[in-house]
C-alpha cells in the first residue's frame, strides 16, 4: 500500500519515513516552564536528528474534576505558542474543543488536534477541516481501529485530507487502557495509508475508580514505547516534565525531562532498524 505523506512545513510525516516526535508538556503551566521544556526538546532532537513538533494544551476542557487546572486559556496560550515559534523555530501542535477555537488557533499553530472524546463530533470535524491546517486525530478509547476510516472520510468530505491518526489505547474494562499493537496497521489500512502515531503518555493512564484525576504507569513508558516503535510508526507522541510529581496534569504518566535523551536514543535505534527491513508480505 502506498503510504500517504502529510507535510508540516518541511517535516514529512509518513509510516515509512523516519519517525517524527510530537512532544512537550501536557498543559501550559507557565510561559517560563514552556520555554524551558521546549528548549530541552529542541536541543535533544537536533542532537539526535529527529524531526520535532512541540505539543502543549492551552485549555484542558475535559478534566475529571471541576477543581482541576485547565490552562491559561486561548489568548494567553497563543501568545506563548507564538513566542516559542519565534524563539526556537519549532512547529507547534495543540488541541481544540470548540468550533469557535478552530480558526484563531490554526492561525498560530501548525497542527490542530481533535481530542479523543470529541473525535466523532461532525460539526467540530468540519470546522477544523475548513482551516486547512494539518489535523491530528486522537483515536477514542471506545472506537475500534477500523472505524477510524469514517472519521478520516469526514475530514476529506469537508475538504481536508492532511490527516494524521494517533493511537492512545483502548478501554480495557473500567478505568484501564490497553494498547493493541495490531490496531496500528488496521488504522493504516482503514484510512488508505494515512500516517499513524502513538501517544505513549496517555496510553499509560490508569485511573483510581473514585479519584478526581488520572493515575499513570510512568515506570513502563520505555517498554510500551519500544513495543510501538517496533511495529513501525510515523511518529511518537510523548509528554515530559522536569518534576512529574508536581505537574498540573497527567504527571503520573509523564516522562521525567532529564530522561528524554536516553529515551529517544532507544526509540531512534528501533525506528532505524525496523525501517531498514524490506517489506514482508505474509498474507499469501
Curated annotation (Swiss-Prot):
Biological-process GO terms, alphabetical: keto-3-deoxy-D-manno-octulosonic acid biosynthetic process
Pathway(s) of this molecule: Carbohydrate biosynthesis; 3-deoxy-D-manno-octulosonate biosynthesis; 3-deoxy-D-manno-octulosonate from D-ribulose 5-phosphate: step 2/3; Bacterial outer membrane biogenesis; lipopolysaccharide biosynthesis
Catalytic activity: D-arabinose 5-phosphate + phosphoenolpyruvate + H2O = 3-deoxy-alpha-D-manno-2-octulosonate-8-phosphate + phosphate
Localization per record: Cytoplasm
Matching InterPro entries: Aldolase_TIM (IPR013785), DAHP1/KDSA (IPR006218), KDO8P_synthase (IPR006269)
Main subcellular location: cytoplasm
Top-tier EC class: transferase
Domain of life of the native organism: Bacteria
EC number from the UniProt entry: 2.5.1.55
GO CC terms in record: cytoplasm
UniProt entry keywords in alphabetical sequence: Cytoplasm, Lipopolysaccharide biosynthesis, Transferase
GO function terms (MF aspect): 3-deoxy-8-phosphooctulonate synthase activity
PANTHER family referenced in this protein's UniProt entry, alphabetically: PHOSPHO-2-DEHYDRO-3-DEOXYHEPTONATE ALDOLASE
Family designation: Belongs to the KdsA family.
NCBIfam families (UniProt xref): KDO8P_synth, PRK05198.1, PRK12457.1
Protein name in the entry: 2-dehydro-3-deoxyphosphooctonate aldolase
Provenance organism: Yersinia enterocolitica serotype O:8 / biotype 1B (strain NCTC 13174 / 8081)
Gene (UniProt): kdsA
